């Protein structure tokens, strides 16, 4: 792939990545996305998304990511479920390495999102997406008037 220079490479597959793919696809830029091995990111562990426009009754995170991907692919987004190993932003075209192969692009959109920090306590794995929350601002309303335990007093949890 090193000989071909793409117009747009997108790294990350959350709502921002698929929105970038949708718009660049509609602009006929033939976007290429590296979604990672866990396409959809944190929303894949989210049972109810109620704070995203267009879903008045809410939607499950995995279902939302499927819809976003299908819509972006409809407009020409090419998705590879692979992890990016490294990038070189020192010169254009930019270089992106995936599984030892170099891809080059005039534009690079990086939307890798965030990653939750898990405690590693007993039972935690089984409860991901079923009561353990890693986003107080996203999920706080679900736990109104409940007794809660927080492991981090970040500003968004207070």
Describe the function of each predicted region.
Residues 1-11, 27, 32, 79-146:
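FAD-binding core/adjacent interface of flavoenzyme oxidoreductases
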Residues 16:
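Hydrophobic/small residue at the entry helix of a nucleotide-binding pocket
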Residues 24:
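Aromatic pocket-lining residues of Rossmann-like dinucleotide-binding sites
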Residues 33-35, 152:
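Conserved acidic E/D residue at the C-terminus of a beta-strand in Rossmann-like folds
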Residues 43-45, 120-121:
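Conserved catalytic-core motifs of eukaryotic protein kinase domains, centered on the activation segment
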Residues 44-102:
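N-terminal Rossmann-like dinucleotide/flavin-binding domain of flavoprotein oxidoreductases
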